[in-house]
Amino acid sequence: MSESLDNSAINQLIPEIFDQMRHNAARTRDAKKPSAMVEESGSITTQSLLRELETLDKVIATIRSIDSVVKGALPSHMNKIHHVCKSTNKMLDNWINIQSQAGYAHHIMDSRTGSKTGSNSNEEVVEQYKQEIAELQKSIKMEEDKLIPAQVKGNGNGPTGQRLYGNSYRQPTGRVTKATALRNARNRPSGIPQISSRLTRPTASSNLKRQR
């Protein structure tokens, strides 16, 4: 097979591959679109294929240059050959990734999320998102306000801010016991000296001794 036949086969095969990729990505989407939108999408696909063909021509030229370098390389140039092959594989992987992401981006732009804003400007789109964020923040604030009374009730806080420790808590009363009154009297400072010995009444014999 000659080189011209190989190039013609590649030029016919590559557009078919990309067209099939986009057809698979947009199969479910195109069924719901009107005919005018389908025709517009087809024209966009044709333009993108032409751009891809130009880029592929540059890639093919690069591959040919690499092939000529490898053919004239010596065994001592194996490290360079390995580096060239690794770079070429990375370039091809990135190219495939670009094509996949392009189809995915095209799908997102035509999805309901992408067409939600319609023909609105960027400022209107940003304003709509700000309103949605404000509504979400308002809903979160309302939910937090509902949770605060439930937490206060669960902690057992009374209306006066005092915590009730079960049934063991008792309100203080105005009654004072005898032991408390005696303790307070002992602790109260006074000028009367305290006598540690016990006071007893004098007996009749002690009175007679004093009279003598």
From Swiss-Prot:
Listed GO MF terms: microtubule plus-end binding
TM region(s), chain numbering: none
Record has Metal-binding as a keyword: no
Region Disordered: start-end pairs: 150-212
Residue ranges of coiled coil: 118-148
GO CC, one annotated term: DASH complex
Subcellular location: Nucleus; Cytoplasm, Cytoskeleton, Spindle pole; Chromosome, Centromere, Kinetochore
GO process terms (BP): attachment of spindle microtubules to kinetochore; cell division; mitotic sister chromatid biorientation; positive regulation of attachment of spindle microtubules to kinetochore; positive regulation of microtubule polymerization; protein transport along microtubule to mitotic spindle pole body
Listed Polar residues bias regions: 193-212
Major localization class: nucleus
InterPro entries xref list: DASH_Duo1
Keywords for this protein: Cell cycle, Cell division, Centromere, Chromosome, Chromosome partition, Coiled coil, Cytoplasm, Cytoskeleton, Kinetochore, Microtubule, Mitosis, Nucleus
Keyword Transport: no
Family in the record: Belongs to the DASH complex DUO1 family.
Function: Component of the DASH complex that connects microtubules with kinetochores and couples microtubule depolymerisation to chromosome movement; it is involved in retrieving kinetochores to the spindle poles before their re-orientation on the spindle in early mitosis and allows microtubule depolymerization to pull chromosomes apart and resist detachment during anaphase.
Quaternary assembly: Component of the DASH complex consisting of ASK1, DAD1, DAD2, DAD3, DAD4, DAM1, DUO1, HSK3, SPC19 and SPC34, with a stoichiometry of one copy of each subunit per complex. Multiple DASH complexes oligomerize to form a ring that encircles spindle microtubules and organizes the rod-like NDC80 complexes of the outer kinetochore. DASH complex oligomerization strengthens microtubule attachments. On cytoplasmic microtubules, DASH complexes appear to form patches instead of rings. Within the complex, DAM1 and DUO1 may form the microtubule connections.
Name of the protein in its database record: DASH complex subunit DUO1
Taxon lineage: Eukaryota, Fungi, Dikarya, Ascomycota, Saccharomycotina
Underlying gene: DUO1
